[in-house]
Amino acid sequence: MEKKLMRIGVSLPGELLDKFDKTLMKRGYSSRSEGIRDAIRTYNQHYEWMQQIKGARAATISLVYDCSKKGITSTLAKIQHEYIDLITSSVHFHIEEDFCFETIILEGEGEKIVELAEKILSLKGVKHSRLTTMPEVKTE
């Protein structure tokens, strides 16, 4: 079965593309296209994994964001207040003049945790984010 290849155009900051190209060279990719295909496959697998998160969970959302982006700090606070029933704690600190690192510790229903993570992960200005989750452990 022949797979049809589609040609796309993507606009990226030069610094991001340079870093991507260097990573591809270090990892031995034969082309930028193959690296992009691999990155898209990984992104899709992560999304599919997130859709399987169900039931009682303990989780963290860790993110690095550009706090100089207009409105991002207040938007993050607003989103977190919408999910206050899930959030048990958070830690926030400044890693550079314009960048903050935050870890949000959560406990609750998996679907709601994913919903919160999706809202945060998609914000413009979030440079890196990671959802980590595990089934809630009950000790009796």
From Swiss-Prot:
Gene3D superfamilies given in the database record: ACT-like. Chain A, domain 2 (3.30.70.1150), Met repressor-like (1.10.1220.10)
Residues reported in the UniProt entry to bind Ni(2+): H81, H92, H94, C100
Reported cofactor(s): Ni(2+)
Comment on bound cofactor: Binds 1 nickel ion per subunit.
Keyword Metal-binding among UniProt keywords: yes
Biological process per Gene Ontology, one example term: regulation of DNA-templated transcription
MF GO annotations: DNA binding; DNA-binding transcription factor activity; nickel cation binding
Entry's family note: Belongs to the transcriptional regulatory CopG/NikR family.
Listed name of the protein: Putative nickel-responsive regulator 2
